Amino acid sequence: MLDLSRAWGGVLTRATPLPDVWAGLAAKEIKFRRGQVCMVAAAPNAGKSMFALVYAIKADVPTLFFSADTDTTTVMMRAAAHVSGHSQISVENNLANDSHYYDSRFEKLGHIKWVFDSSPSIDDLELEIRAYVELYGQAPELIVIDNLMNVTAETDNEWAGLRAIMMELHDMARKTEACVLVLHHVSEQSEYGSPINPPHRRAIHGKVSQLPALILTLGYDPSQGTLKVAAVKNRFGPHTADASNYAQLLVNYAACQIGDEDQFGRMLRRDTMAGYQGGYNV
Protein backbone atom coordinates (compact mmCIF):
# COMPACT_ATOMS: atom_id res chain seq x y z
CA MET A 1 0.00 0.00 0.00
CA LEU A 2 1.02 3.60 -0.68
CA ASP A 3 0.16 7.01 0.63
CA LEU A 4 -1.69 9.17 -1.88
CA SER A 5 1.23 11.43 -2.83
CA ARG A 6 3.45 8.44 -3.64
CA ALA A 7 0.68 6.72 -5.59
CA TRP A 8 0.15 9.94 -7.55
CA GLY A 9 3.86 10.16 -8.29
CA GLY A 10 3.79 6.72 -9.89
CA VAL A 11 0.98 7.56 -12.29
CA LEU A 12 2.29 8.56 -15.71
CA THR A 13 -0.81 9.59 -17.63
CA ARG A 14 -2.88 11.20 -14.85
CA ALA A 15 -6.06 10.96 -16.98
CA THR A 16 -4.30 12.87 -19.75
CA PRO A 17 -6.82 13.90 -22.42
CA LEU A 18 -6.35 12.60 -25.93
CA PRO A 19 -6.45 15.26 -28.67
CA ASP A 20 -9.69 17.13 -29.29
CA VAL A 21 -10.83 16.60 -32.87
CA TRP A 22 -14.21 18.38 -32.78
CA ALA A 23 -14.56 21.84 -31.26
CA GLY A 24 -18.21 21.15 -30.48
CA LEU A 25 -17.28 18.34 -28.11
CA ALA A 26 -14.43 20.31 -26.55
CA ALA A 27 -16.85 23.15 -25.80
CA LYS A 28 -18.93 20.69 -23.75
CA GLU A 29 -15.76 19.47 -21.94
CA ILE A 30 -16.11 16.06 -23.59
CA LYS A 31 -12.66 14.51 -23.69
CA PHE A 32 -11.41 10.96 -24.07
CA ARG A 33 -8.77 10.38 -21.39
CA ARG A 34 -5.96 7.89 -20.96
CA GLY A 35 -6.24 5.38 -18.15
CA GLN A 36 -10.04 5.57 -18.30
CA VAL A 37 -12.83 3.50 -19.83
CA CYS A 38 -15.05 5.60 -22.09
CA MET A 39 -18.25 4.40 -23.74
CA VAL A 40 -20.17 5.46 -26.83
CA ALA A 41 -23.68 4.01 -26.91
CA ALA A 42 -26.34 4.37 -29.58
CA ALA A 43 -29.12 2.62 -31.43
CA PRO A 44 -28.27 0.62 -34.59
CA ASN A 45 -27.33 2.77 -37.61
CA ALA A 46 -26.74 5.89 -35.51
CA GLY A 47 -23.08 5.84 -36.54
CA LYS A 48 -21.20 4.82 -33.41
CA SER A 49 -18.69 2.69 -35.36
CA MET A 50 -18.11 5.50 -37.84
CA PHE A 51 -17.80 8.01 -35.00
CA ALA A 52 -15.09 5.87 -33.37
CA LEU A 53 -13.30 5.31 -36.67
CA VAL A 54 -13.22 8.99 -37.58
CA TYR A 55 -12.10 9.91 -34.06
CA ALA A 56 -9.29 7.33 -34.15
CA ILE A 57 -8.09 8.62 -37.53
CA LYS A 58 -8.21 12.30 -36.59
CA ALA A 59 -6.77 11.89 -33.07
CA ASP A 60 -3.56 10.52 -34.63
CA VAL A 61 -2.31 8.69 -31.53
CA PRO A 62 -1.04 5.08 -31.34
CA THR A 63 -4.22 3.03 -31.53
CA LEU A 64 -5.24 -0.63 -31.33
CA PHE A 65 -8.67 -1.04 -32.90
CA PHE A 66 -10.65 -4.23 -32.22
CA SER A 67 -13.23 -4.18 -35.01
CA ALA A 68 -15.33 -7.19 -34.03
CA ASP A 69 -18.68 -5.77 -35.14
CA THR A 70 -17.54 -4.21 -38.42
CA ASP A 71 -15.86 -6.39 -41.04
CA THR A 72 -12.61 -5.66 -42.86
CA THR A 73 -14.25 -4.62 -46.15
CA THR A 74 -16.57 -2.11 -44.49
CA VAL A 75 -13.75 -0.59 -42.44
CA MET A 76 -11.57 -0.42 -45.56
CA MET A 77 -14.22 1.46 -47.54
CA ARG A 78 -15.07 3.82 -44.70
CA ALA A 79 -11.45 4.63 -43.94
CA ALA A 80 -10.66 5.17 -47.62
CA ALA A 81 -13.70 7.42 -47.98
CA HIS A 82 -12.72 9.50 -44.97
CA VAL A 83 -9.09 10.09 -45.95
CA SER A 84 -9.85 10.66 -49.65
CA GLY A 85 -13.12 12.58 -49.45
CA HIS A 86 -14.70 10.16 -51.92
CA SER A 87 -18.08 8.56 -51.40
CA GLN A 88 -18.11 4.96 -50.23
CA ILE A 89 -19.69 3.99 -53.56
CA SER A 90 -16.79 5.60 -55.44
CA VAL A 91 -14.32 3.86 -53.13
CA GLU A 92 -15.91 0.49 -53.84
CA ASN A 93 -15.72 1.07 -57.60
CA ASN A 94 -12.13 2.33 -57.45
CA LEU A 95 -10.99 -0.65 -55.37
CA ALA A 96 -12.75 -3.05 -57.72
CA ASN A 97 -10.63 -1.70 -60.57
CA ASP A 98 -7.41 -1.33 -58.58
CA SER A 99 -7.00 -2.88 -55.13
CA HIS A 100 -4.06 -0.51 -54.44
CA TYR A 101 -5.92 2.65 -55.48
CA TYR A 102 -5.82 4.19 -51.99
CA ASP A 103 -2.47 2.88 -50.77
CA SER A 104 -0.89 6.35 -50.66
CA ARG A 105 -3.84 7.71 -48.70
CA PHE A 106 -3.49 5.02 -46.05
CA GLU A 107 -0.31 6.66 -44.77
CA LYS A 108 -2.74 8.72 -42.66
CA LEU A 109 -3.79 5.48 -40.94
CA GLY A 110 -0.34 4.23 -39.97
CA HIS A 111 -0.95 4.95 -36.29
CA ILE A 112 -3.85 2.45 -36.16
CA LYS A 113 -3.40 -1.32 -35.91
CA TRP A 114 -6.42 -3.53 -36.48
CA VAL A 115 -7.81 -6.79 -35.10
CA PHE A 116 -10.84 -8.23 -36.92
CA ASP A 117 -11.68 -11.22 -34.71
CA SER A 118 -15.51 -11.27 -34.67
CA SER A 119 -15.89 -12.67 -31.14
CA PRO A 120 -12.75 -12.11 -29.07
CA SER A 121 -12.50 -13.09 -25.44
CA ILE A 122 -10.87 -10.93 -22.79
CA ASP A 123 -7.83 -13.22 -23.05
CA ASP A 124 -7.70 -12.54 -26.80
CA LEU A 125 -7.76 -8.79 -26.19
CA GLU A 126 -4.96 -9.04 -23.65
CA LEU A 127 -2.83 -11.20 -25.98
CA GLU A 128 -3.16 -8.64 -28.77
CA ILE A 129 -2.19 -5.83 -26.40
CA ARG A 130 0.86 -7.77 -25.24
CA ALA A 131 1.82 -8.39 -28.87
CA TYR A 132 1.47 -4.66 -29.56
CA VAL A 133 3.71 -3.80 -26.60
CA GLU A 134 6.30 -6.35 -27.67
CA LEU A 135 6.30 -5.01 -31.23
CA TYR A 136 6.31 -1.28 -30.48
CA GLY A 137 7.83 -1.12 -27.01
CA GLN A 138 4.85 0.66 -25.48
CA ALA A 139 1.12 0.23 -25.05
CA PRO A 140 -1.27 2.03 -27.39
CA GLU A 141 -2.72 5.31 -26.16
CA LEU A 142 -6.17 4.43 -27.50
CA ILE A 143 -7.83 1.00 -27.51
CA VAL A 144 -11.17 0.78 -29.33
CA ILE A 145 -13.57 -2.12 -28.69
CA ASP A 146 -16.28 -2.36 -31.37
CA ASN A 147 -18.34 -3.51 -29.65
CA LEU A 148 -19.05 -4.75 -26.14
CA MET A 149 -21.67 -7.29 -27.25
CA ASN A 150 -19.11 -9.03 -29.48
CA VAL A 151 -16.68 -9.76 -26.65
CA THR A 152 -17.16 -13.34 -25.47
CA ALA A 153 -18.22 -13.64 -21.84
CA GLU A 154 -17.36 -16.51 -19.51
CA THR A 155 -20.93 -16.84 -18.24
CA ASP A 156 -24.28 -17.63 -19.85
CA ASN A 157 -25.95 -14.79 -17.94
CA GLU A 158 -25.86 -11.87 -20.38
CA TRP A 159 -25.94 -9.05 -17.84
CA ALA A 160 -23.42 -10.69 -15.53
CA GLY A 161 -21.20 -11.33 -18.54
CA LEU A 162 -21.34 -7.71 -19.70
CA ARG A 163 -20.49 -6.44 -16.23
CA ALA A 164 -17.60 -8.86 -15.90
CA ILE A 165 -16.21 -7.73 -19.26
CA MET A 166 -16.52 -4.08 -18.23
CA MET A 167 -14.58 -4.80 -15.04
CA GLU A 168 -11.82 -6.39 -17.12
CA LEU A 169 -11.75 -3.41 -19.47
CA HIS A 170 -11.55 -1.09 -16.47
CA ASP A 171 -8.53 -3.02 -15.24
CA MET A 172 -7.06 -2.95 -18.75
CA ALA A 173 -7.29 0.85 -18.86
CA ARG A 174 -5.52 1.12 -15.50
CA LYS A 175 -2.70 -1.26 -16.43
CA THR A 176 -2.03 -0.01 -19.96
CA GLU A 177 -2.79 3.65 -19.16
CA ALA A 178 -4.64 3.74 -22.47
CA CYS A 179 -8.04 5.22 -23.14
CA VAL A 180 -10.28 2.18 -23.63
CA LEU A 181 -13.14 3.32 -25.85
CA VAL A 182 -15.90 0.72 -25.89
CA LEU A 183 -18.92 0.92 -28.19
CA HIS A 184 -22.24 -0.42 -26.98
CA HIS A 185 -25.93 -0.69 -27.81
CA VAL A 186 -28.92 0.92 -26.15
CA SER A 187 -32.27 -0.71 -25.46
CA GLU A 188 -35.24 -0.19 -27.76
CA GLN A 189 -35.33 3.51 -28.61
CA SER A 190 -39.14 3.68 -28.54
CA GLU A 191 -38.98 3.57 -24.74
CA TYR A 192 -36.79 6.65 -24.54
CA GLY A 193 -38.03 9.06 -27.19
CA SER A 194 -37.14 9.94 -30.75
CA PRO A 195 -34.25 8.03 -32.40
CA ILE A 196 -32.87 11.31 -33.75
CA ASN A 197 -32.04 12.41 -30.19
CA PRO A 198 -29.41 10.89 -27.88
CA PRO A 199 -30.85 8.24 -25.53
CA HIS A 200 -30.94 8.66 -21.77
CA ARG A 201 -28.29 6.93 -19.68
CA ARG A 202 -30.87 4.43 -18.43
CA ALA A 203 -31.29 3.20 -22.02
CA ILE A 204 -27.82 1.64 -22.07
CA HIS A 205 -28.15 -2.09 -22.61
CA GLY A 206 -27.22 -4.29 -19.66
CA LYS A 207 -27.00 -1.45 -17.14
CA VAL A 208 -23.20 -1.23 -17.43
CA SER A 209 -22.85 2.49 -16.77
CA GLN A 210 -21.09 2.23 -13.40
CA LEU A 211 -17.46 1.89 -14.53
CA PRO A 212 -16.91 4.22 -17.51
CA ALA A 213 -15.59 7.68 -16.67
CA LEU A 214 -17.32 9.06 -19.76
CA ILE A 215 -20.46 7.84 -21.49
CA LEU A 216 -21.67 9.44 -24.70
CA THR A 217 -24.95 8.63 -26.41
CA LEU A 218 -25.63 9.49 -30.05
CA GLY A 219 -28.74 10.59 -31.91
CA TYR A 220 -28.57 10.72 -35.72
CA ASP A 221 -31.02 12.54 -37.99
CA PRO A 222 -30.36 11.37 -41.57
CA SER A 223 -32.79 13.90 -43.05
CA GLN A 224 -30.87 16.83 -41.54
CA GLY A 225 -27.32 15.47 -41.53
CA THR A 226 -26.93 16.03 -37.80
CA LEU A 227 -25.29 13.89 -35.12
CA LYS A 228 -26.17 14.87 -31.55
CA VAL A 229 -23.62 13.79 -28.93
CA ALA A 230 -24.66 13.86 -25.27
CA ALA A 231 -22.47 13.22 -22.25
CA VAL A 232 -24.81 11.26 -19.98
CA LYS A 233 -21.92 10.60 -17.60
CA ASN A 234 -18.70 12.60 -17.30
CA ARG A 235 -16.43 12.46 -14.26
CA PHE A 236 -14.37 15.36 -15.56
CA GLY A 237 -17.06 17.70 -16.85
CA PRO A 238 -20.75 18.53 -17.12
CA HIS A 239 -23.27 15.86 -18.00
CA THR A 240 -27.00 15.21 -18.02
CA ALA A 241 -28.31 11.70 -17.45
CA ASP A 242 -31.34 12.45 -19.62
CA ALA A 243 -29.13 13.58 -22.56
CA SER A 244 -30.82 16.98 -22.63
CA ASN A 245 -27.50 18.82 -23.02
CA TYR A 246 -25.68 17.77 -26.18
CA ALA A 247 -23.18 18.88 -28.79
CA GLN A 248 -24.21 18.83 -32.43
CA LEU A 249 -21.94 17.67 -35.22
CA LEU A 250 -22.73 17.83 -38.93
CA VAL A 251 -22.20 14.74 -41.05
CA ASN A 252 -22.21 13.12 -44.44
CA TYR A 253 -22.04 9.41 -43.66
CA ALA A 254 -21.98 8.48 -47.35
CA ALA A 255 -18.45 9.88 -47.45
CA CYS A 256 -17.61 9.02 -43.82
CA GLN A 257 -17.21 12.67 -42.85
CA ILE A 258 -18.09 14.18 -39.46
CA GLY A 259 -17.55 17.89 -38.91
CA ASP A 260 -18.21 20.77 -36.56
CA GLU A 261 -20.79 23.49 -37.06
CA ASP A 262 -18.36 25.41 -39.25
CA GLN A 263 -18.08 26.03 -43.00
CA PHE A 264 -17.00 22.46 -43.78
CA GLY A 265 -19.63 20.96 -41.49
CA ARG A 266 -22.39 23.08 -43.00
CA MET A 267 -21.33 21.87 -46.44
CA LEU A 268 -21.56 18.26 -45.24
CA ARG A 269 -25.04 18.90 -43.91
CA ARG A 270 -26.23 20.60 -47.13
CA ASP A 271 -24.86 17.74 -49.20
CA THR A 272 -26.54 15.12 -47.02
CA MET A 273 -29.88 16.88 -47.31
CA ALA A 274 -29.43 17.16 -51.09
CA GLY A 275 -28.37 13.54 -51.50
CA TYR A 276 -24.82 14.43 -52.60
CA GLN A 277 -22.48 11.68 -51.46
CA GLY A 278 -18.91 12.88 -51.64
CA GLY A 279 -16.05 14.54 -53.48
CA TYR A 280 -14.38 16.55 -50.72
CA ASN A 281 -10.88 17.97 -50.46
CA VAL A 282 -9.65 16.55 -47.14
Predicted segments, located by residue:
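A short alpha/beta connector and helix-capping loop motif
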Residues: 156-170, 179-180, 226
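Hydrophobic/aromatic beta-strand patches that form the interior of the parallel beta-sheet core
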Residues: 38-40, 64-66, 115, 181, ...
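The Walker A/P-loop phosphate-binding site
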Residues: 1-86, 274-282
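Conserved inter-motif catalytic segment of the P-loop NTP-binding fold
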Residues: 63-156, 276-282
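Structural recognition of the conserved hydrophobic beta-strand(s) that form the central parallel beta-sheet
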Residues: 144-145, 178-185
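Cofactor-binding loop segments of dinucleotide-utilizing enzymes, especially the Rossmann-like FAD-
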Residues: 68, 185, 220
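Short, well-ordered alpha-helix to beta-strand connector turns
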Residues: 35, 59-60, 109-110, 212-213
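C-terminal regions of RecA-like/P-loop NTPase motor modules
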Residues: 1-5, 9-15, 23, 44, ...
